[in-house]
Amino acid sequence: MTHPRVPIPKRGVDYRGKIVLAPMVRSGECPSRLLALKYGADLVWGPETIDKALIGCTRRLNPITNTVDFTRYSNNGVKHGGGTEGQRESVIYRLHPEIEGTKLIYQIGTSDPETAVQAASMIAPDVAGIDVNAGCPKPFSTTGGMGAALLKTPDKLCAILEALVKEVGNKHEIGISVKIRILDTLEDTEKLVRRLVATGITGLTVHCRTTPMRPRERAIRDQLRMIVNVCHEAGIACLMNGDVTSRDEALQLMQEYGTDGAMIATAAEKNSSCFRSEKDGGLAPWQEIAKEYMRFAMEVENRWGNTKFLLAQIIPGKAPAHQAMAKTRGYFEVAQALELGDELIALAKSVDERLEIGVVKKETKAERKAKNKVAQQTAQEKREQKAAAKTMPRTSRSRSPAAKKRKVDIGELNMPLDVSREMGPGTVTGQASTLAV
């Protein structure tokens, strides 16, 4: 039976036939996505980023990393009138347009149609699609009415999707999709999915676990065929997520359940070559993965804490290199510990210097605080001086009648005319013009 297919926008991507990197908070940053693409991922999802975190950011082209950075300053100094002088600028979202621009899906955390549209509109020109997170069970997401909490407020979820389709998808010619979890009963899940596919989305991903379930619990696929059928009736692509460990397994599950694609999460966190089929080489050794990950991490100057976390997932816990890596404080030290070669070690040293990490002396929190305090005091003094100048009587601000405008012919050197050169300013001769002083 032939099913209808919703049209894919000009700049969007079709999820059908795709094995993709799942959105993961710490494991979906720029170098992880680039590594997944290198080893065969068809599309990559970025980590859930809250709409309010992106709103207020400045889009910057980074000539050093060749990335597009969305950055912002802390609100602390600004709200106390100190401006941004002396503050560190934080990177909220970083993407590599040349490598991943046409394959990157931005996942948004939101609970409001208006802020969702505002944030998504900022990044839409740089990505291939916007995906709404309606499945994250973590408190940082659900307490704000986002993530899996949206499953309990279907009216709000549908309103968000409809607003994004109309105001962002149509205007920027990209697709809008949603990622959900299954509900407790088949009937409840079907009712929800039927509403979602009618909002104008181009794709739906289902994580085959309920909200209370955790990754260690086995995925439930009993409802999957029903969800696939509902999506296909509406012409929507359906992806599955949960306990998918490799490309070959994903293809097998797609055939078994009829899904259009699959997401890989935990397995990709440990070894991104899981996106490569056995016939193309299968899993690469961890040493290769660690080296390639380090290369990407340094090229985009990834935050060191995130890089170290990912290396801890990639390097087996019992390997001597794992313990050596755990003691490192920056890229240079870990490049030496992993024996990555002269080229990468040299790159690591330069990255550490730019990021002020590792063996490079880093400005302490107390030093930054003191610098910010001085900047705030200076700004306050300037404001007070400006205010005082405005209130000063006009006559007192005018020039005194007795004051004379300095002229060249009355300028004099304050020393005897017969002074020797050795006793005067080093480069001034007796015949020099007073203008040269």
Task: List the predicted regions and their residue ranges.
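Alpha/beta catalytic cores of nucleotide-metabolism and tRNA/nucleoside-modifying enzymes
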Residues: 1-25, 30-31, 38, 81-83, ...
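Glycine-rich, positively charged N-terminal anion/phosphate-binding segment
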Residues: 2-13, 26-122
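Active-site beta-loop-alpha junctions enriched in small/polar residues
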Residues: 24-26, 49-51, 109-111, 135-137, ...
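Non-cysteine beta-strand/loop elements that form the S-adenosyl-L-methionine
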Residues: 46, 129-138, 198-209, 262-269
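Short beta-strand segments at enzyme active-site cores
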Residues: 46, 130-134, 172-180, 203-207, ...
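Conserved radical SAM core fold
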Residues: 49-55, 134-148, 205-213
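Active-site beta->alpha loop and helix N-cap motifs at the rims of alpha/beta catalytic domains
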Residues: 69-175, 181-185, 189
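Catalytic beta/alpha-barrel core
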Residues: 107, 133, 152-154, 205-209, ...
